[in-house]
Amino acid sequence: MAFDELLNDPVIQKYLHELVGPTGMPVAAAPPDGEVTDEELAEELGLELNDVRRALFILYENDLATYRRVRDEDSGWLTYLWTFHYENIPENLQSEMYRLLDALEERLEYERSHEFYLSEPAGIRFEFSEAMELGFQCPETGAPLEPIENQEMINAMERRIDSLQSELNVGVTQTV
C-alpha cells in the first residue's frame, strides 16, 4: 500500500488519531519526505513545539518514526532529525487486532463462567460471590441486587471474535 493511500484510509486515520490525539494529528497526517526537525514541523504546521515533540515521540514509540541526533559544532546543541516510517502501520494494526482478540477471548471466558447481579439505581454489576458477601444489597444505595442475564453480551463478543478471526484468518475451523 502506497504512502498516500495509507494516509487516505479512514482506518489508518483513526489509528493515528488514537495514537497522537487531536493536537498531534496534523503532525501524523502530513509527514514530510525525508528528514525534518521538530522545529521545522512546528513552524510549517503552525503548532506549539511541545505538541509536535509529543506527537513525534508517540510515533517513535510505535515504530512509525525514527530520529538521529546531530550536534551543532558552534553551539553544541543537539538537533533531532526525524524520519517517518508509515510502512509499519499495517503490521502495527494487525498486532493490535491480535491483542484485541486475546482480550476479547479472555473476557468472553470470564462472562461465561460468572453469574452477575445488578444494582439498578447505582448501575453497578457484581459477581455472585460479591453479591453474596453483600447480602444481595447494594453497598451504595441499599437497593436489592437483581440477577442479570449476560447472554446478549456473550453473543456480541462471540460475533466480534468471529469477525476478528475471519479478518486475521485464524481460529477458523475448516470442514474436510
UniProtKB/Swiss-Prot annotation:
Disulfide bonds: none annotated. The keyword rRNA-binding does not apply. Keywords: DNA-binding, Transcription, Transcription regulation. SUPFAM superfamilies: Winged helix' DNA-binding domain. It holds the Pfam family TFIIE_alpha. InterPro entries: TF_E_archaea, TFE, TFIIE/TFIIEa_HTH, TFIIE_asu, TFIIEa/SarR/Rpc3_HTH_dom, WH-like_DNA-bd_sf, WH_DNA-bd_sf. SMART domains: TFIIE. Gene3D superfamilies: Winged helix-like DNA-binding domain superfamily/Winged helix DNA-binding domain. Belongs to the TFE family. Transcription factor that plays a role in the activation of archaeal genes transcribed by RNA polymerase. Facilitates transcription initiation by enhancing TATA-box recognition by TATA-box-binding protein (Tbp), and transcription factor B (Tfb) and RNA polymerase recruitment. Not absolutely required for transcription in vitro, but particularly important in cases where Tbp or Tfb function is not optimal. It dynamically alters the nucleic acid-binding properties of RNA polymerases by stabilizing the initiation complex and destabilizing elongation complexes. This is Transcription factor E. It comes from Haloquadratum walsbyi (strain DSM 16790 / HBSQ001). The lineage of its organism: Archaea, Methanobacteriati, Methanobacteriota, Stenosarchaea group, Halobacteria.
